[in-house]
Structures are given as structure tokens and as C-alpha cells.
A protein has these predicted regions:
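A short, structured loop/turn motif at beta-sheet edges
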Residues: 61-63, 99, 117-124, 148, ...
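Hydrophobic residues positioned within well-ordered beta-strands of beta-sheet architectures
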Residues: 67, 90-92, 154-156
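Positively charged n-region of N-terminal signal peptides that target proteins for export
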Residues: 1-5
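Short structured motifs
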Residues: 53-56, 75-80, 137-142, 153-154
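Short, solvent-exposed beta-strand/turn "edge" segments of beta-rich domains on protein surfaces
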Residues: 73-91, 103-105, 143-147
Length: 188
């Protein structure tokens, strides 16, 4: 029941945060490594603006918000953070900073920017499903509105389909906006 309420609230907030995506983007080139587990590949964009939007070095920068990934790990079924899941999860801890006067919370900010993929199907894109909240300390703060220039911590988990294939995190400028970049996380 709580999961359904969270998803419904998130969907509503996603429609609000979709306004975060200003379709003008800066030019991004190159490839950087974020840490020993991850590499970042920025995409080339054709549009230019004064605002630099990107996803590299574990950080997504958009016009209205910034999301910094601080930790990742695989949590097995039954372990703390995945007590009720049916599959292992890839858990991500992050900080969301609101750079605007818009109503943004950490959960909808994340969902508007990121999707996770495990490329283990030769015929279709395998987008991972969101799992339960992997860290109970964020139960009360995950949907709180972040003040302008304020930063709130949160976590998210994706249900893994296997424990071999790396997870590709893809960032976009809002829900259906241009791709900002992608980062590969090894889960072994």
C-alpha cells in the first residue's frame, strides 16, 4: 500500500518536475571515469546555452537541480535494505540540490532524470524496475520539498535481473528530454 502511494505521489510530482527540463543544452564531449566502479560517457549535443547541463563524475547537473551520487551497492534478498524484495537490488545513495524556485523533492528529481538499464537482452532494452527504499532513514524526507539552494539526501534501489551484467544509469534533461550522459556500474 505504501509503495503504491509512493509511486502515485511520485508520478504526480514527475508531471510537475517535467517543467524542470529546459530543452536548451550545452555542448558536452568526452569520457571521464567517476571511480573504480564507474565510467562516464558524455554524449555530444547540438544545442548551446549559457547553462551547462551534464552527467559525469557521479553528478547530474541540470538547470533546476543537481544530483550527486554518493554511494552504490548491491543488496541481496533478505539483507538490510532489501528485507522484503524478491530480487537483489542495486542501491544508490544520492544528494539532490534544488537550484530553482520550483517544488522539487529528492524522489521525483531522481525519477525525472535517471533510468537504469541492464543490457542482458539481445532483442530489447531491459529497463530496471524501482525496488523498495533501501534506507529507512529517508522514509520521512524522500518526498519533502527542497528549498532553493537546499540539499536533501535520499536513496533509490533498482531490482536486478542478474548479478553479472553491469547497470547502465542514463541521465536525461527531464523525463523525455535530451540525453545528458550515461555511467556504467559494475555489480560483481
Amino acid at each position: 500500500m505504501m509503495k503504491k502511494a509512493l509511486i502515485l505521489t511520485s508520478a504526480l510530482a514527475l508531471s510537475i518536475i517535467a517543467g524542470c527540463s529546459n530543452q536548451d543544452e550545452g555542448t558536452k564531449n568526452g569520457s571521464n571515469s567517476a571511480n573504480k566502479e564507474a565510467t562516464t560517457k558524455s554524449t555530444n549535443e547540438k544545442k548551446e546555452t549559457n547553462n551547462k547541463v551534464s552527467f559525469k563524475d557521479n553528478e547530474a547537473k541540470l538547470n533546476d537541480l543537481k544530483i550527486k551520487i554518493t554511494e552504490t551497492k548491491v543488496i541481496q534478498v533478505g539483507e538490510k535494505g532489501n528485507e522484503y524484495g524478491k530480487k537483489p537490488v542495486f542501491a544508490i545513495w544520492y544528494e539532490t540540490t534544488n537550484l530553482s524556485d520550483k517544488e522539487i523533492n529528492p524522489t521525483t528529481g531522481w525519477m525525472a532524470v535517471f533510468k537504469a538499464v541492464q543490457d542482458n537482452n539481445p532483442n530489447s532494452v531491459n529497463t530496471l524496475e524501482i525496488g523498495g527504499l533501501p534506507d529507512d532513514q529517508f522514509l520521512d524526507s524522500q518526498l519533502e520539498t527542497i528549498k532553493k539552494d537546499g540539499t536533501v539526501k535520499n536513496a533509490v534501489a533498482y531490482e536486478l535481473d542478474d548479478l553479472e551484467t553491469p547497470v547502465k544509469l542514463i541521465a536525461t534533461q527531464g523525463i523525455s528530454g535530451d540525453k545528458l550522459g550515461e555511467q556504467i556500474f559494475n555489480i560483481k
